[in-house]
Each structure stands twice: as structure tokens, then as C-alpha cells.
From Swiss-Prot:
The record marks R22, K29 as: Transition state stabilizer. The keyword Cytoplasm does not apply. It comes from Nocardia farcinica (strain IFM 10152). It holds the Pfam family IspD. This is 2-C-methyl-D-erythritol 4-phosphate cytidylyltransferase. GO terms for biological process: isopentenyl diphosphate biosynthetic process, methylerythritol 4-phosphate pathway.
Amino acid sequence: MNDADNDGSVVALVPAAGRGVRLGEKSPKAFVPVGGTPMVRLAVDGLLAAGVVDRIIVMVPAEWVESAVALLPPSEVVRVVVGGAERTDSVRAGLAAAPDAGYFLVHDAARALTPPALIGRIVGELRAGRRAVVPALPVVDTVKSVDAAGVVTGTPDRAALRAVQTPQGFTADLLRAAYAADVPATDDAGLVERLGEPVHTVAGDPLAFKITTPLDLRLAETLLDRRAAL
């Protein structure tokens, strides 16, 4: 499919099939509540609040489809499909469910507090002509590279490093091409980089942190409590 075949719509893909092992949960991480609301619901609410997303596709384990439909906002905009064993499998399922999309956002459900304004910045850059855009924050800690024995082998220049967040935005044809190449990468932007395509950055937001550990979960709950008190 090329750009002439799409309808120009922005479709957000939300992989939500990963397990909550590091959170000490048996359910998929996306279904773990933060302040009483599942992460995936918070993430979807943020995408809707941004006002720049036309459709949202949430990919969940087959046995969690009914639960996901029940907890997500009733809307023609939001659709739940079966995801895969790996994150890349889930994204592929999302791509297949939106054949007419013009742009894709791939957003971690675990980044449940991502501000709508950040989502708007990503879509704004895509609409302005960028083909791949990711939110990023400067790295504040010193980073060391180490060998297999844990011995330091180098210290990268921190000024050139960025911590990348989601949603990551792409033109539909570019993201489809990246997944068709079937090469290993730790995120969607990494797949695009393997094609030799430039990936642009916009200012990220500390609130778009990924809820991965019990400490992250406590922080997110505290932030939600403070938001509710305002």
C-alpha cells in the first residue's frame, strides 16, 4: 500500500498483551489498575483526550478480549483485537486491522499518564511531513557500556543520548515496510532505523514514563491522586 491508498486517518495501536511479571501480577500488565483504573483504560483515555486520533486499536490476549471491551470506553473509535505472543506480533495484528490508515501511533499501555499534549505534538509533526517521529527526553544519568563480565568498557557522551518514549508516530507505509523487513529491534523506531529512514524527535514528557516496577506503580498512583485533588 502506498500513500495514495490511505484515507489520511491517524490510528493508534496499543499493544496490551504483555504479562505483568515485573509488577508481580498474573494478569496482563495493561490490566493492572492505577488508582483503581486499568492502565490500558488510562492510556486510551489519553489518546481520546488528545483530539487528534481517529481510531484506536487495542491488542490483547484472546482470553482477555471480553474484559477489555467491558472496561474500555464504549465508542466506535475504539476496537479490541487479539494480539500475539510478542509485542511485534501484536503490532502486526493492529496493522492488519487498519488497512486504510494514513498514519500510525504505537503507544505503550504502560505509559498510562502520557499527556494529551504530547500525543498532539507527535501527530502535528506527522501532518507537517515527518515520516517517523518519537518523543524523547535528555538522559540525566551517566551511562556506562560494560562487557559480559560487568567491566566498564566505555562512557557514551550523555549529551548525544535520549530516552525515547511513546507514542511513536509513523506514516502507514513506512511502518508497514519496517514490519515487513522482519528484523530485530527494541522498539518500532528501531525497525524504521534499520530501513535507513531518519527518525525525528520531539520533546518528551516526564509523565510519559513506563510503569514497569512496583515503584513505578506507586509513583503513578501518587500522581493520579494529586491530579484528582486539583
